[in-house]
Amino acid sequence: MATFISVQLKKTSEVDLAKPLVKFIQQTYPSGGEEQAQYCRAAEELSKLRRAAVGRPLDKHEGALETLLRYYDQICSIEPKFPFSENQICLTFTWKDAFDKGSLFGGSVKLALASLGYEKSCVLFNCAALASQIAAEQNLDNDEGLKIAAKHYQFASGAFLHIKETVLSALSREPTVDISPDTVGTLSLIMLAQAQEVFFLKATRDKMKDAIIAKLANQAADYFGDAFKQCQYKDTLPKEVFPVLAAKHCIMQANAEYHQSILAKQQKKFGEEIARLQHAAELIKTVASRYDEYVNVKDFSDKINRALAAAKKDNDFIYHDRVPDLKDLDPIGKATLVKSTPVNVPISQKFTDLFEKMVPVSVQQSLAAYNQRKADLVNRSIAQMREATTLANGVLASLNLPAAIEDVSGDTVPQSILTKSRSVIEQGGIQTVDQLIKELPELLQRNREILDESLRLLDEEEATDNDLRAKFKERWQRTPSNELYKPLRAEGTNFRTVLDKAVQADGQVKECYQSHRDTIVLLCKPEPELNAAIPSANPAKTMQGSEVVNVLKSLLSNLDEVKKEREGLENDLKSVNFDMTSKFLTALAQDGVINEEALSVTELDRVYGGLTTKVQESLKKQEGLLKNIQVSHQEFSKMKQSNNEANLREEVLKNLATAYDNFVELVANLKEGTKFYNELTEILVRFQNKCSDIVFARKTERDELLKDLQQSIAREPSAPSIPTPAYQSSPAGGHAPTPPTPAPRTMPPTKPQPPARPPPPVLPANRAPSATAPSPVGAGTAAPAPSQTPGSAPPPQAQGPPYPTYPGYPGYCQMPMPMGYNPYAYGQYNMPYPPVYHQSPGQAPYPGPQQPSYPFPQPPQQSYYPQQ
């Protein structure tokens, strides 16, 4: 009697998980680090796990189910850790409908989506399906088999119920029928009913009280009845499921009535006993008459009939209790011992996360935002200090300090100028600047080409998508490329803006270079040439040891100390490192969301508060020193002898000092620009890879969608058949009855029966046909046979009956036909009939029209009878 329903597994196409995940890991984590290598190995293991779980047929045992559960747990674990989407990590998963068997012109229905939620739903479906198959394979004659079956049916019910609640939110479009909410909801109820049936079998085996067994059976009957009601009006499950559900409903109801009748007998309610046994017998009779192909209830039927016969006999001879109507009986109670097992990840008890140390995407995004805030704070503080240093150098250069207090002889190069000259020469001089400026346009052009190529890929794919959308209209059901590419195009626009600003910055650097190139060239010359290029002046009166010179030297020394302190502060700002991962993870665990701004600002104030205070103090200290230097320099200028030669010399020295500052700034800016372009190249290459990956994924999705569209178009019914013209329906000059409509092509051809004996050969016109010729049963009024043309030869065999025959039942014996002629070829496939083949004068007639004949000989085909 026990017939259990199990679910077929869905089939999928192979997907390489490792390649896109490894790309993301390499772009996200530092190159060459142990962390990156570990995650790359984990991605390879994940790809192997998918192949083991869904890429091959699975046996019906616990080990195969454990592999499926491990894969499901793993994809649930990585979902928050990787940005799976159509425009980031784009993985297209293709799954076939588990219940669709395909058609003549195409395979089974399948759906391809770039959604990890879709993959999760399909894998969980397979977990439930395999659990149902394992449960159905159990030996229910022992407690262990009953226990395993009940556990797996309840798990399958919970898994199907989980899919019902989550599938629509996980997918961006309608799912296939097998994972639609209606279908999985029905499957969940079927699995729950079978779990209840297992508990009923357990109670029966343990010989529990009949009242309890009756309640368990009645509850199982309700579950089966509800499942049957849900699916009988929807063509979603295989057809063989419906009769099994109906039979199980009746059988469980009969069991409930049977055990309740035993309870009634114990309570001396003999009339109720008979009424319940009669109802049980009727239910089992219905099952035996309608569903005997699916379930065997002979033993149970005999058991009920024996009990009913004994009860009637005892009641008729002893008790004489009135047999009540069924509607007057008290309803049987219900007791459920099953419930759908909720899906709580991890499901597998042996699960180990391959990416255990990887943080969720929300934490990664918060860390990226925190690092950006940190970089902004550090860069802002460093920029303030560098601007202050540049300002100080500019003020000193305009005052010709410290060269003014060093140049007392008027005919030698001041020591500060010599130091700056040696520094310029050591850094490569003007040749370094020339080389760096020459490289900038090449770097810029390379970046532009990468960006243009990336956007070209998007443009081409979008144009193709638009063309196909215009061609197929509403059939083209996927996200439009122009919507999908909006983030990428915004990113590309941002890169374009960055390049435009870089071009402007390059122009400013070149302008500065042209303005100060000659002075920098002079600063690169040897000391004798440099000294010769500087105008000499009359020896100034000795001011060494004067108070104003000593004050200036002290102020300049303090300013140098401030500059050195800034270098230390800059290093301190760059070296501070604090990992916010733990704080973000704690916030995510406690609140479910991360308030990144509040957490980051608080932590940055704590870590960098002291350093930023020192930066502001350094700026204020420099401001005071520069004011004092300017005041002291005014006094120094008044004391210094003034003449034209001295003024000209001082101007040249100022220009040389300014040239040094400009050289340092140019080299720094050019190196920064080169570094910027090289780093931008890496970013643009990643952007190009991202564009290339998504375009490739879209092309793959497009090909799958086109294939599905072709199959769906092929499955669509063709145009209505053209009605047969009137002149083809009967021979000329006759009114023979219309032949029966040929069988539809979906009906298997009926095996032909031996035909009736044919009538005797047609005699000459002066002799009548034999009145004793046999007539086939059911034939209509025969049309007169065509008269024999005088002088023509008689036919080589008996003429066939001049009346139509029904499909599959030819009414005449096969006679020699023209080469290639097959009178059954078109009739088997319901093809339209061409015009009647007219006979030539003097030609022996063909048999009467069974079906319209053919205008030309057809290729040889296999007929029902061998050709003679």
Curated annotation (Swiss-Prot):
Residues 176-868 are annotated as: Interaction with EIAV p9. The modification Omega-N-methylarginine is found at residue 745. Residues 717-720 are annotated as: Interaction with TSG101. Residues 737-763, 792-807, 844-860 have a biased composition (Pro residues). The modification Phosphothreonine is found at residues 479, 738, 741. Keywords: Acetylation, Apoptosis, Cell cycle, Cell division, Cell junction, Cytoplasm, Cytoskeleton, Host-virus interaction, Intellectual disability, Methylation, Phosphoprotein, Primary microcephaly, Protein transport, Secreted, Tight junction, Transport. Residues 418-868 are annotated as: Interaction with SDCBP. It is linked to Microcephaly 29, primary, autosomal recessive: A form of microcephaly, a disease defined as a head circumference more than 3 standard deviations below the age, sex and ethnically matched mean. Brain weight is markedly reduced and the cerebral cortex is disproportionately small. MCPH29 is characterized by small head circumference apparent at birth and associated with global developmental delay, impaired intellectual development, speech delay, and behavioral abnormalities. Affected individuals also have poor overall growth with short stature, mild dysmorphic facial features, and seizures. This is Programmed cell death 6-interacting protein. It comes from Homo sapiens (Human).
